[in-house]
Amino acid sequence: MPESIIAGIPVHFPFEPYEVQRAFMEKVIICLRDGTNGVLESPTGTGKTLSLLCSSLAWIRTRQSEQQKQIRKLQDAANNTKVGPTGIVPGEAAELALTVGKANNWGVPKVIYASRTHSQLTQAMRELKRSAYAGMRSVVLGSRDQLCIHPEVMREQGNSNKVNMCKMRVHSKTCSFQLRVESKKDHPDFRGPSIMDIEDLVKVGQKLKMCPYFASKELVNDADITFMPYNYLLDPMARKANKIELSNTIVILDEAHNIEKICEESASVQIKSSDVAVAIEDVTHIMRIFTSADSQDFSGDEPKDFTLDDLTLLKEMLLELEKAIDGVVVDNLAEGTTYPASYMYELLAKANFTYGNCASIVALLDKLVQYLMVASQNNSSMIMRKGGSFLVLAELLTIVFANKEDIMAKVHRSFKVHVEVEEAKQNAGKPAPKQQQQGGWLGKGNNTSNSSSSNKAKVINFWCFNPGFGMEQLLNTQVRSVILTSGTLAPLKPLIAELAIPVAQHLENPHIVDQSQVYVKIIGTGPDRQQLISNFKNRDNPKYISSLGQTILNVSRIVPDGLLVFFPSYPMLNKCVDAWQTSGLWADIAAKKPIFLEPRGKDQFTTTMEEFYQAIRDSKGACFMAVCRGKVSEGLDFADRNGRAVIITGLPYPPLKDPKVILKRRYLEANRTKENQLLTGQEWYNLDATRAVNQAIGRVIRHRHDYGAILLCDSRFQDNSQVQQLSKWIRGHLGARPQCSPFGPIVRELRQFFRHAEETMEQPKERTDEPLLKNVYKTEAVTQENNEEKPLFKVKREPGQMATNAAAFKQANEMAIKVEMTNSIKSWTPDDYVSAAGRTQSHSQSKPPNAMDFMSRLDSNVSSIDFNSTGTGNLVKIHKRERSSPTFGDTKSSSQLKKRYKLVDNIKTEPSTSSSCKAPESRADFLREVRCFINQDEFRDFGKALLAYKNGGDEAFESLMSLLFKLLGKPQMRYLLLGIRRYLKNEHKAEFDKRVAT
């Protein structure tokens, strides 16, 4: 690889670095050389991550080389045994220096590379693998949730439960995987590869039957660079638990645009009345089994880590804490009441929680958690208690008393206590717990407006509004350098002021692309000349919502491939979707590009992204609607065809009346001076929204040869205060005095921009792997529950047939057979209803019946392909089916056409009374067929009943059954009624069969 001398250090880069990359690497090396801190901004797509890794590791390698020379010198001197004129033996002195140098690792710093999410860390490790520094030792630290391979631990729900179960098994020496770490940690399969990400660690762990979680920690001491999430560094409890040593370490915080919030959150904590109540119950429970004969069943003759006196004292303290919280007055039941920071210390002091005994109590709580886990494991008849309340209390004490007594004046300025009423958890059909019957906190959920606040359960929030606390704790660990970097850090001065760290190097890089590769416009009015402004007063305006939809529709006709649309919030996204469905705009947009909505669930998110990336390969592309600050806007890669344009529909301001937002603004106003250059409360409020916009914009234009459009569809973007907070490279495209442009000229310019780009820019090759998402399918076969199935059809593409697309067909086939949960019923999406009404043009392949295909895939935005083509060569024709009259004959005809295709033999079909009529196997075809037999109102009721059944229980099932027999009870529709059986939850199928039989 080419070598460049940057700041005196030879740096090997995969190609000749661009000027912005050279400037960035120079700043990094200067920080490392001088032991100073840096704040460096470089737009997404400028090779920031690669520049970070190459420059920092080049400096490390140079230092290692220098130290090797020093070692050789000392070794040569150690071999010289002649006595000098002073009587000192040089060899002995050199040998001593050699020993001391090795013990101190020769003073060569190590790199800790931290980012917000593990997907971002995975991307960084990919960059490292393709660099000249792939041979340097690296390791990634992950959570038990990602790395644990013990089947019983992985069955636990929730990360905290997995942590406790793991600790219990390690403590009791019952985890064979962890016990095997010591004997397998030097195995070539584990020590051989220099770079192993999370997936690699899990594979090696499974192969060697060795715990990847604990094994990864064995690599830290020898690693030149360690990858980890932010919270491992900034959270004091996580840092302690993972035994992270930061002395003489280079800390790189990538994607640091949210670093202030992360620092504030790491120093904040919350405890609820119910947490204290459960802790009291758990202590009482331990005292009971501690003194009973049954305790011998799981404790044996080993000395216990605590005494009955310890438990008695802790229970007394918890009862006093409950009493103290009971006495807290909440003046405003709706919004809560704010107290100064000293109130938290006074509250804890009433229960005798102090600086003096904090450490010993936290240690006791940790022992009690382990005790409960062992007790529950060894006595299956006991109620499973996992000590979650003890962990909450331990976190509270650790964070509150982490602030030393000598800085209490600063604590009082930077922290606030906010008390809210705790909402009751509804346990329908279950008897009230004992604590509730006795009037304890678990029973204080009947929060009526006329009851006094002292009779209510409380939520005590200890909030930090000064991110400098988190950074100060980091600097106090004697790190060598801290480098903050992101594509959206500006303005830098307020950021540096808030973090309160000395910064010697700062940088705002321009973008790497030419002006001709980016089209940026502010769209102030829609095609109907309605003003586009997503403020509080206008967001419910039907005319505005309609105009915004028309704008997106017109843009979707012009933009090739992927179109991203970001909304200020989920409620605004849902409001627009509902309105556009009703008006028909949704179907019009979907006809141009299949629409995908950002889901909130982790599993659904991965699946949706895979389907979107696949749909991009269709000639029409796809449209993804997401939310600023959501998962899509934070770190995902929409390079090249995946994202040719991004539409920002509004400014995502934080909730104005949120207590935390109010208190943050007050903190800034109270502590702002000319010297510290803090923002005003209003400036911070505006900047918080604009940074989220900058981050969303950064999803497109991901490399030097990429191109795309950025459309800001809110007239407020022309305000000078908003423009100045946009990234520097975007401001350059808007000009000195940005103004809203008329919609007509924008459409013409946008069309010309893409026509010119497609003619002059290098077009990307077809990608074989999708960014940050695991390739979960195989070309030849897919394994599902130990059954292998080969693709049923082969698809050919002929020139000129835009409707026929092999990749789209492949997507539909493979996504249909990829099932993550065997009994999962997910949300209906707007596309399902549009498809059922026959208004979309893109369909996905029908596949053989599968007990999970319909309901478990309801969150998919990929419609179905109907195989009605009578042409040769097994070509699949994607067509638009017109609404036909609701006659049984039409349905039968469609069914006959489908019989041309042979299904696999081992698929079970549902019982039917008719040999000629079967319910369609495809979700969309099933909905479409139901739609043919019932009217619009009945179909709406049908959809609502299914949505209710998704999260409901027996009552929702009864409602669904009543409606199904009403709508589909006629003889000619019986096959549809029977066909829905395979989409029911397992516990309801027997009852369904019984009712159908009668």
From Swiss-Prot:
Q: Which GO MF terms does the UniProt record name? A: 4 iron, 4 sulfur cluster binding; ATP binding; ATP hydrolysis activity; chromatin binding; DNA binding; DNA helicase activity; DNA polymerase binding; metal ion binding
Its domain of life? Eukaryota
Instruction: Identify this protein by name.
Output: Regulator of telomere elongation helicase 1 homolog
Where does this protein hold ATP?
Answer: S42, P43, T44, G45, T46, G47, K48, T49
Q: Name one GO cellular component term.
A: nucleus
Predominantly, its location class is: nucleus
Q: Which residues carry this modification: Phosphothreonine?
A: T887
Q: Which UniProt keywords apply?
A: 4Fe-4S, ATP-binding, DNA damage, DNA repair, DNA-binding, Helicase, Hydrolase, Iron, Iron-sulfur, Isomerase, Metal-binding, Nucleotide-binding, Nucleus, Phosphoprotein
- Give the span(s) annotated as Disordered: 426-454
Matching PROSITE patterns: HELICASE_ATP_BIND_2
What InterPro entries is this protein classified in?
A: ATP-dep_Helicase_C (IPR006555), DinG/Rad3-like (IPR045028), Helic_SF1/SF2_ATP-bd_DinG/Rad3 (IPR014013), Helicase-like_DEXD_c2 (IPR006554), Helicase_ATP-bd (IPR014001), HHD_RTEL1 (IPR049909), P-loop_NTPase (IPR027417), RAD3-like_helicase_DEAD (IPR010614)
> What Enzyme Commission number(s) apply to this enzyme?
5.6.2.-
UniProt keyword Methyltransferase present: no
- Choose any GO biological process term that the UniProt entry carries and state it: telomeric loop disassembly
Species assigned in the record: Drosophila willistoni (Fruit fly)
Query: Where does the protein end up?
Result: Nucleus
Where does the UniProt annotation place the signal sequence? none
